[in-house]
Amino acid sequence: MAYLFTSESVSEGHPDKVADQISDALIDNFLAFDADSKVACETLVTTGQVILAGEVKSNTYLDVQQIAREVIRKIGYTKSEYMFEANSCGILSAIHEQSADINQGVDRAKPEEQGAGDQGMMFGYATNETENFMPLALDLSHKLLQELAILRRENKEITYLRPDAKSQVTLEYSDDNKPTRIDAIVISTQHDDFDEEAAMLAKIKKDVIEILIPRIIAKNPEHAHLFNDKINYHINPTGKFVIGGPHGDTGLTGRKIIVDTYGGKGAHGGGAFSGKDPSKVDRSAAYATRHIAKNLVAAGVADEILVQVSYAIGVAEPMGIFIETYGTSKVNLTNGEIAKKVEAIFDMRPYFIEQRLKLRNPIYSETAAYGHMGRKPETVTKTFSAPGGNEKTVTVELFTWEKLDFVDQVKTAFGL
């Protein structure tokens, strides 16, 4: 029997994502000047105020206020009527030194013996229902908001958009687990107060259906068949949405972990990513398990794969690796036997994850909105500034965990 599945996303201007982006901008700046920095940075954003708190072990000093303001400015909070504005918001820093008790579990004389920064379990997931091996409902939810942000910055076809927004896509699946159509789309977008409420809501709904949706279809022709005239659109269903962003809702780092990963597909170990340097396995091992799952699916081991890894704090070797193929395996092996082969291909000790995926680089700001997974790997050059005229330009690879660089090795190991 056909069934429905739903995923959501939030925009870069959503309060929780503002917090994530500030935390990850701090991570990038610390790593740019000291690649061995250990950082855990949490951010709270609310009406006219940003609070930074966390633990740091680094040889560099940063102007954290300036970094936070630049992130807020880039997102688009640049008007006083938003009640949260880059130049005028207050910024309080309570960042202090990392505990020596925690650090002793991570630092080792031999780098390869580096212990996990914490206990816990992390999951990676991949499915072949999209070209980027991501669940389709989440992928479309991200793309709706990315395109809405493009329209906001263009300020031509739609001129009233503000930074805060959310989306949700409900797909209908067939008995054989294939997406057949979009059943519903929900979009709530912050906007200027430009007319009477009923007129504003009618205009916004019309623009979403007649401007945003055609642009999504044009950029994603492989999914055009899923769009139809029976889609149930809920556009700003609560009414006008003028008060938004951190003024409308307080935002915190790490509160959008399902948006960041697989939209409710697969599983999640509970640990957030943003604000954590790669010694924190919550982040590095989640990227590594995604890398494994994606390469296994791309190699043809299964149509859908979930990978779990677990750690004890201060211990390099993982407690174990678990594989689930949801009955889609293409190889004559049990899930346990697949896991054994995976262990032989991918070294999951924290140091080797960092080296394999080049994680000790300033690559995290780009992950902090529109999902950490399913993004396109690319090489970029970035410039960072620190007090005293100190400047650093680095060329880095983004989203290395999305590379299909182990497919041949996987095929050889599994005889594919």
UniProtKB/Swiss-Prot annotation:
Kindly give the PROSITE patterns that the UniProt entry links to this protein: ADOMET_SYNTHASE_1, ADOMET_SYNTHASE_2
| CC annotations in GO | cytoplasm
Question: Principal place where this protein is found?
Answer: cytoplasm
Q: Which positions in this protein are listed as binding Mg(2+)?
A: 16
Please give the cofactor(s) recorded in the UniProt entry for this protein: Mg(2+); K(+)
Q: What class of enzyme is it?
A: transferase
The molecular function GO annotations come to:
ATP binding; magnesium ion binding; methionine adenosyltransferase activity
Quote the catalytic activity from the record: L-methionine + ATP + H2O = S-adenosyl-L-methionine + phosphate + diphosphate
EC number of the protein:
2.5.1.6
Q: Where does ATP bind?
A: 14, 164-166, 240-241, 249, 255-256, 272, 276
Keywords noted in UniProt: ATP-binding, Cytoplasm, Magnesium, Metal-binding, Nucleotide-binding, One-carbon metabolism, Potassium, Transferase
Pathway the protein acts in = Amino-acid biosynthesis; S-adenosyl-L-methionine biosynthesis; S-adenosyl-L-methionine from L-methionine: step 1/1
Can you tell which superkingdom this protein's organism belongs to? Bacteria
> Which residues of the sequence carry a binding annotation for L-methionine?
55, 98, 249, 280
Q: How is the subunit organization of this protein annotated in UniProt? A: Homotetramer; dimer of dimers.
NCBIfam families the UniProt entry points to: metK
Q: Which family does it belong to?
A: Belongs to the AdoMet synthase family.
Name this polypeptide is given:
S-adenosylmethionine synthase
- Gene responsible for this protein: metK
